[in-house]
Amino acid sequence: VLFSTADPEELMNDPRVDAVIIASPDSLHVPHLKLAISSGKQILCEKPIATSLEEARLIAEEIRTYQKNVGKKMINFGFMRRFDPSYQEVRRLIRSGDFGSPTFFRTVTRNVFSTGITSTGLFTNIAIHDFDVYRWLFDDEWESIQSFYPRNSTLSPEGLSDPLIIIGKLKSGIMMVGDIVAFNNYGFDCRIEVVCEKGSIQIGTHGDVVTQINRVGGVIKAGPMAENWMERFEASYIEELRAWIHEVSTGEVNLDLATVEDALIANEVSAMGLASIPK
């Protein structure tokens, strides 16, 4: 560590700093992105781009103008599941064609705890991972999202609508059924199953990839569960940082790194999901 400061503007403008990672609370992403634009440094900003769609669209336009003036991509966004070895393997298996075309998938993200989360944050902080990674996984765009609150959990803080059920449809016709749980009390639980014409592909709680094809079924790994997402996705964060550092240092664009357009779309889909909740 060369130095420390409580002033983010001082940090970003310091000549000893080559590039900046923004990992501040979600509500500070927009002001910190504005400082990043002023600094002229390359930035990796953790998702979301903003906590509201209006703010997301405004800052996205500022970033577009900034990058157009500079002549290259300067700001990426952190959606680490794109770099998770298990998600990358599922993507490879889907693209192999061996399983036929995907028809629908199930997805689960259940946290032990989600400090400071709000009902809106269930979309912009947690479900936003699903909205991004499945665009990337299927190379597709979202057509519709319908969200529901089932019976509320007694483990959730007062005023929080938790869990959340989401039914989504991609433009290709692939459908999703997913659930988001902010407080579950049993362990970090993140799983998917992609059901294809000729078989299924699953990611288990421990990140193991299991397939069912040609009358041969794999077995999901058992064992102690992670306490939180940082333990489960540690390798994903590291690979994302390596990819970003390589892009910054060499100028070679990594297509898996999320752009401002990816970040904005994730917020737009989150807003679509929030607006779809029955009144």
Name each model feature, range by range:
Residues 19-21, 64-74, 243-279:
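C-terminal helix-rich "cap/oligomerization" subdomain common to oxidoreductases
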Residues 112-175, 180-189, 261:
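Rossmann-like dinucleotide-binding domain that binds NAD(P)(H)
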Residues 3, 18-19, 74, 104, ...:
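Short, Asp-centered acidic motifs that coordinate Mg2+ and/or phosphate
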Residues 158-159, 171-242, 256:
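NAD(P)-dinucleotide binding in Rossmann-like oxidoreductases
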Residues 1, 39-41, 66-73, 174:
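A short helix->loop->beta-strand "cap" motif at the edges of active sites that frequently abuts
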Residues 50-114:
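A contiguous active-site-proximal alpha/beta segment in oxidoreductase catalytic domains
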Residues 2-62:
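Beta-loop-alpha module in the N-terminal Rossmann-like domain of NAD(P)-dependent dehydrogenases
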Residues 6-9, 109, 150:
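Conserved SAM/SAH-binding loop
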